[in-house]
């Protein structure tokens, strides 16, 4: 199970080009392109929003806000950048604005964990509970780094840019987080 977090089934070169094309079509006013972008990226956007807001309903609302902003700002995307990075930066910025406004720092409830889509990764209920327990032991920033790498397939360098952290810090926090999770999953920290 932990190996799923260490490697991803992600084809960044193909996805990057396809996402760039979708953004160009969105900038041209094509609603179908927005629907396709939403279908392909919503899990990653929602996961990042949930990691910041810690409330399933707020994360769903913010996810919708991200795609409204994509529709309004698609012409501002520059193809030299990562489309997923652009989208997740937009999500992060909206999350930070909402958190400043509402000053919310609560823990995820059981109901909110259930709202996280895990069907795509093939986890059964027991594995999901174990993973939840392991993730809950991490600091917020460590959890964000692990989820960004595991859910979105982002490279550590992209995560560092998104979170505005030095690459060595991201790598250190990622490996420390995996070590904590491994310890928990092996029963050393139960």
Please report, for each region that a protein language model flagged, where it lies by residue:
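Arg/Lys-rich amphipathic alpha helix in sigma70-family domain 2
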Residues: 72-79, 88-109
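Structural recognition of an alpha-helix C-terminal capping motif at a helix-to-coil junction
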Residues: 47, 61-68, 81-93, 172
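Short helix-capping/turn signature of helix-turn-helix
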Residues: 40-43, 51-54, 137, 147-154
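Conserved RNAP core-binding helix
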Residues: 18, 42, 46, 56-73, ...
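DNA-recognition helix of helix-turn-helix
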Residues: 92, 96, 142, 151, ...
